[in-house]
């Protein structure tokens, strides 16, 4: 069943999570005004899946069940699936800024791979167990929170060496009917308005850290789960032309001796497969982040065009404005092209699903992570200083100032002052507000820091092939000297014949 956004909001009423926000308990997540922008953003993924014009991108046939499911819950099987997912994420983020639910997709795809790997290595039954869970999630059209990033404590110490073991989620007890987990996940996207959490390890583990290599599904309102969250976006702020409607909450999620039955446990101490799960999720998620931030970039490009027009400028005549816009387009479409390439060159996994190309996915995410601030700078350049100097919206209706402001803050004659002010506040919201800083930081660190992506690129790039390519060119004489003799690759020889020891003077 494909739910609508209204259905999704209503479904949250069936849960009673323990949530704290701004120092108080939240009685009803669905009715909390400070969380409404986050619920609205996730809701976009539901409504768009029900629109006929978006059906190809937003829905897919699940190969293991034959059912039509939301793209955000689908297991990718082909390069086309990867490309459609990338385009779907861009689409929903064009509307919402960050639709958040694509994390569910990324975790499910990583689990599909890791559970099969664990079964093959250890004779476990995780994969069938996961498939049963997957089909249930798809049938109910749920949204899953990815509880992956642990609190970590002293980062110079491994999980098992921490003074406080609860800075990482770990297994404290194994029972005949399940496991008990304890610990803290520090950064959980959309935590209060998820249906369930997928608890996953955030790093590779050693045998000594086996208790921390745990993956399981936990309802958001399970006994022992506490969520301490922040508000989503800028709810209730009149100047927030975008993020008063759409935003994202993040939460610290504490697991205090939470019982998880075995049918919801997908790894329990298999540390090597925990590493597979972590790296697989990272690749899927970085691929999705490319689509998400391209959607955000589309908002900046559109707002930039409107600001230029309302300021009375013509990019065809004002080359510096045109150049700035082209640079913004180049950045957005440049990292998005890496996402397309990662889709086209995706590799089949032994589990039967497909994985985005690791190098292209990481290069694309690294580009957007390191260029998000350039995107904001270019948007500021074409907009001008008005976006941060504009009086608040209350002055738009103040009889003492309204007429004067409308007269002096108008730009082009055929564009009313209120339209110019509206787009200026939109641009401020996206690029020069607290929410703008949030977009910058999640772009930089979301899905892993730039250093993590650099390591993956270095680890997976075919450097040996590139080295051998040049060695073959040298062997073929492509880099021969002027005499036509090629340089030999034989160690210790600088030419084809080798160096000759000169005979002593006066000999012979």
Model-derived regions, located:
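A short core secondary-structure module
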Residues: 184, 188-235
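Glycine-rich beta->alpha junctions and the first turn(s) of the following alpha-helix
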Residues: 236-333
């Amino acid at each position: 069943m494909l739910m609508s956004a209204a259905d999704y909001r209503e479904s949250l009423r069936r849960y009673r999570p323990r949530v704290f926000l701004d120092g108080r308990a939240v009685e009803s997540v669905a009715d909390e005004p400070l969380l409404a922008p986050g619920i609205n953003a996730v809701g976009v993924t539901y409504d768009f899946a029900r629109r006929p014009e978006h059906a190809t991108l937003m829905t897919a046939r699940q190969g293991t069940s034959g059912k039509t499911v939301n793209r955000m819950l689908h297991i990718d099987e082909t390069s086309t699936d990867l490309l459609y997912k990338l385009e779907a994420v861009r689409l929903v983020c064009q509307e919402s800024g960050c639709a958040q639910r694509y994390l569910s997709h990324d975790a499910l795809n990583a689990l599909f791979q890791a559970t099969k790997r664990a079964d093959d290595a250890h004779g476990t039954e995780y994969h069938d167990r996961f498939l049963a869970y997957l089909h249930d999630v798809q049938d109910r059209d749920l949204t899953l929170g990815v509880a992956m990033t642990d609190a970590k404590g002293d980062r110079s110490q491994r999980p098992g060496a921490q003074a406080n073991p609860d800075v990482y989620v770990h297994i404290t007890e194994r029972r005949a009917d399940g496991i008990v987990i304890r610990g803290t996940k520090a950064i959980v996207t959309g935590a209060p308005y998820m249906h369930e959490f997928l608890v996953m390890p955030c790093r590779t583990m050693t045998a000594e850290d086996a208790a921390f290599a745990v993956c399981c599904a936990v309802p958001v309102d399970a006994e022992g789960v506490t969520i301490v969250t922040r508000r989503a976006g800028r709810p209730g702020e009149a100047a927030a032309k975008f993020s008063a409607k759409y935003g994202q909450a993040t939460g610290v999620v504490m697991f205090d001796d939470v019982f998880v039955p075995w049918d919801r446990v997908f790894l329990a101490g298999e540390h090597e497969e925990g590493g597979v799960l972590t790296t697989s999720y990272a690749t899927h998620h970085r691929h999705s982040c490319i689509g998400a931030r391209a959607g955000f970039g589309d908002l900046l490009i559109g707002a930039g065009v409107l600001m230029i027009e309302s300021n009375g400028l013509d990019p065809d005549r004002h080359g510096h404005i045109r150049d700035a816009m082209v640079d913004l387009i180049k950045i957005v479409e440049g990292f998005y092209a890496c996402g397309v390439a990662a889709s086209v060159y995706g590799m089949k996994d032994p589990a039967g699903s497909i994985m985005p190309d690791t190098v292209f996915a990481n290069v694309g995410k690294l580009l957007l992570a390191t260029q998000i601030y350039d995107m904001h700078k270019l948007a500021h350049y074409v907009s001008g200083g008005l976006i941060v100097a504009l009086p608040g919206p209350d002055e738009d209706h103040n009889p003492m100032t309204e007429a004067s402001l409308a007269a002096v803050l108008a730009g082009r004659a055929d564009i009313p002052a209120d339209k110019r002010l509206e787009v200026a506040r939109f641009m401020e919201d996206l690029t020069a507000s607290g929410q703008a800083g949030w977009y910058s930081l999640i772009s930089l660190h979301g899905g892993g820091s730039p250093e993590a992506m650099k390591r993956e690129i270095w680890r997976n790039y075919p450097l040996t092939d590139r080295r051998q390519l040049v060695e073959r060119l040298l062997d073929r004489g492509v880099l021969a000297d002027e005499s036509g003799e090629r340089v030999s690759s034989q160690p210790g020889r600088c030419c084809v014949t080798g160096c000759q020891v000169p005979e002593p003077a006066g000999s012979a």
